[in-house]
Amino acid sequence: MAPKKDAKKPEPPKKAEPAPAPAPAPEPPKADAVDLSGVKLDFTQDQMEDYREAFLLFDRVGDSKVAYNQIADIMRALGQNPTNKEVTKILGNPTADDMVNKRVDFEGFLPMLQVVINNPNKATYDDYVEGLRVFDKEGNGTVMGAELRIVLSTLGEKMSEAEIDALMQGQEDENGCVNYEAFVKHIMSV
C-alpha cells in the first residue's frame, strides 16, 4: 500500500494589509535666529539721520514703526542687498502672519541693519557680472533677455513676474539682449 499523502488544505488567500503610512518628512532645521542684543552699532550721526528718514518713509500707519515684511525693502533702499532668508533669520524666523502683522521701531531696526552691513558674504559688482557672464554665449557682453527672465524666476531667490518686469524695464535692446554689466549697475542702484 502506498504511503498516504498529506492532503494539504488550500490556504485561504492572505488579506492585503495596507502599506504603512510613510513617515512624515522631517522639518528642515530652522536657522537659528540672530541675537541682536549684543550688536554694537557703528553709525555716525549723519548716517543715523539718513537711516531714520528712509525708515520713516516706509511707515504706513504713522506710529513710527514698520511691518516685518518691509525690513528687507528698507535695507535695500539703504544700499544693502540682504537675501530674504537672511532677513527672516535676523527677524527670528517669523511666521507669514508675523511678517505682515508684527512691527518694529527704528531703534529695533538699527541692530538688524548693522548685522547686514557687517555680513562678510556680500556679493560685489564683479561677482554678479561673473555670474551673468556664464550666460553670454557669444562673448559680446550681452545675454538674452528671455534667458535672464527664466534665470531670475527659477534660480536662487525666485522673483515674481511683476518683479522681473520692473527690473528688466528698459534693459533689453532691439534684439532682446541685455548688456549684463549695465544691468548689474542698474540693479545695484535700485
Swiss-Prot record:
Molecular-function annotations in GO: calcium ion binding
Domain EF-hand: 46-81, 123-158
Role this protein plays: Non-regulatory myosin light chain required for proper formation and/or maintenance of myofibers, and thus appropriate muscle function.
Entry comment describing in which tissues the protein is expressed: Expressed in fast muscle fibers during skeletal muscle differentiation.
Swiss-Prot/TrEMBL keywords: Repeat
InterPro entries: CALM/Myosin/TropC-like (IPR050230), EF-hand-dom_pair (IPR011992), EF_hand_dom (IPR002048)
UniProt protein name: Myosin, light chain 1, alkali; skeletal, fast
Ranges where the record places region Disordered: 1-33
GO CC annotations on file: contractile muscle fiber; myosin II complex
Top-level taxon of the source organism: Eukaryota
Binding partners and assembly: Myosin is a hexamer of 2 heavy chains and 4 light chains. Does not bind calcium.
UniProt biased composition (Basic and acidic residues): 1-17
SUPFAM superfamilies documented for this protein: EF-hand
Listed Pro residues bias regions: 19-28
Gene source species: Danio rerio
Cross-referenced CDD domains: EFh (cd00051)
BP GO annotations: skeletal muscle tissue development
Phenotype on disruption: Morphant embryos have curved bodies, bent tails and a marked reduction in touch-evoked escape response. Muscle structure is altered and myofibers are sparse and disordered.
